[in-house]
Amino acid sequence: MDFKAGQHQVQHLPAETLQFLLGSRYCETDVLSEEAWRLFKDTPLGWPRVQAICDFVHNHLAFGYEHARPTRTAAEAYAERRGVCRDFAHLAITFCRCLNIPARYCTGYVSDIGIPPPHAPMDFAAWMEVYLGGRWFTFDPRNNGIPFGRILIAQGRDAADVPLT
């Protein structure tokens, strides 16, 4: 963890990160941009801003497997205030992108070590990676703790890039 990892100016980002600044099927940056700036405009850039986004999403959404809906977008999750891990990830990714922070969707297995219920052992989960300080860092707005014990299966712009069958 590099809690001092800084945010890059857009013109200094590597070309391969730029696609992770754009809106996508489940991450509607055009819908949530004003809200992102309203909520986080005064938050310090870089790691503190991303952590503030994760803290907000973690507290704003109610988690529950009964809330699972495969078509829910970030804007819908924000309005409905509920979802599953993919909704937490989509909302945090969207806020990051609105604030010019490259963020990508990750899916895989998360260890149950040190993570409070409700979750199944070695639960299939979604989280995000954010580009700060010249590298990608893992953030999990659903569990909102130091991420460890993850098995990455796929990465993409959002869940549409890495569908489960």
Q: Which ranges hold each PLM region?
A:
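Secondary-structure boundary elements
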Residues: 3-6, 11-83, 91, 159
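Hydrophobic/aromatic-rich core segments of domains that either
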Residues: 55, 87-165
